[in-house]
């Protein structure tokens, strides 16, 4: 099946990944890990669940994510979670997605899994740590979950030769030729590996990681994908120029995602220390706009658009542009 969203969001899906990865192989000698630039577009997946276009998606696995709070248009996302035929959640918490899931699997905690940091293969450094304890009860690490699922679905066991993360990580670091026997030995005696610094690597490796081999201010790959090669400003889809009637009903521009940083999506709200620092939800508004609307710092306000509304307290700050709020 064709990757959902790859026809519109080309850079972060198969078309962009293929072009970028080919250049990575030319300069690095290996392809770019699929973690980068190789994703189905999330909102398009939810739309496909609801509409059946371009094809019907019948199953969804939510691994360490709470889609209701992680994507825009929460109502559409929630409707998709309710409609999909088979929903599985792997997480620490009983998230809204978990409440609608057919199966919920508890994930192993940070102390129950070994750690490797390679930035998904995008850098040439390796850092690691040992697990403190084996997973308790019926908790599983990500690798354990996907390995068992793959084997249960009939995948070739030869594709899953490792039974533990330590075996996988030992395999990953083996080509480095480091003076260690396995992953635990690496963690105990090396822990962090950075290769020797080489200046002017672009000379010996055939240039930079671009089709031209040069630093590109005008991206060849973006142009090949049908986008402008240079950064171009485009207003939001629902702007006052293209939608003057909508602007009359909703005259303030809403931006999101710039909230209190220890909170990310739905993370850390259960932590007493975080709630002590930030017990209530706040939105940011310029003092000039607040004065026009007779809003004072700390006032509870309704924030509303055509998709829904929420109630938050006002945080007056000159950092916000007049006419724009962040919630």
Regions found by a protein language model. Give the residues of each.
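Alpha-amylase-like alpha-glycosidases and glucanotransferases acting on alpha-linked glucans and related
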Residues: 131-147
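Charge-patterned, long linear interaction tracts outside catalytic cores
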Residues: 155-159, 165-178
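Short, charged beta->alpha transition segments
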Residues: 45-49, 142, 161-162
């Amino acid at each position: 099946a064709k990757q959902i969203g790859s026809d519109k969001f080309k850079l972060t899906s198969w078309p962009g990944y293929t072009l970028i990865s080919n250049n990575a192989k030319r300069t690095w000698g290996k392809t770019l890990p699929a973690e980068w630039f190789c994703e189905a577009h999330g909102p398009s997946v939810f739309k496909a669940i609801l509409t059946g276009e371009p094809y019907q998606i019948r199953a969804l696995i939510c691994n360490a994510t709470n889609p209701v709070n992680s994507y825009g248009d929460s109502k559409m996302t929630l409707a998709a979670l309710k409609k999909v035929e088979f929903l599985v959640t792997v997480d620490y918490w009983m998230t809204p997605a978990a409440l609608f899931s057919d199966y919920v699997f508890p994930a192993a905690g940070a102390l129950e899994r070994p750690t490797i940091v390679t930035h998904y293969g995008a850098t040439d450094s390796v850092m690691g740590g040992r697990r403190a304890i084996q997973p308790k009860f019926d908790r599983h690490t990500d690798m354990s979950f996907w390995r068992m699922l793959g084997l249960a679905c009939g995948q070739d066991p030869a594709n899953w030769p490792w039974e533990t993360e330590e075996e996988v990580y030992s395999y990953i670091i083996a080509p480095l030729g480091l003076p260690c026997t396995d992953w635990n030995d690496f963690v105990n005696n090396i822990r962090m590996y950075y290769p020797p610094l080489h200046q002017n690597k672009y000379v010996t490796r055939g240039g930079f990681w671009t089709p031209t081999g040069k630093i590109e201010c005008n991206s060849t790959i973006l142009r090949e994908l049908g986008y402008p090669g240079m950064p171009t400003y485009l207003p939001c889809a629902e702007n006052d120029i293209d939608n003057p009637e909508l602007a009359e009903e909703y005259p303030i521009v809403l931006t999101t995602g710039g909230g209190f940083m220890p909170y990310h999506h739905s993370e850390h709200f259960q932590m007493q220390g975080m709630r002590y620092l930030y017990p209530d939800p706040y939105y940011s508004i310029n003092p000039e706009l607040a004065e026009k609307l007779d809003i004072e710092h700390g006032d509870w306000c309704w924030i509303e658009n055509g998709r829904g509304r929420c109630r938050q307290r006002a945080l007056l700050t000159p950092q916000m542009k007049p006419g724009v709020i962040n919630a």
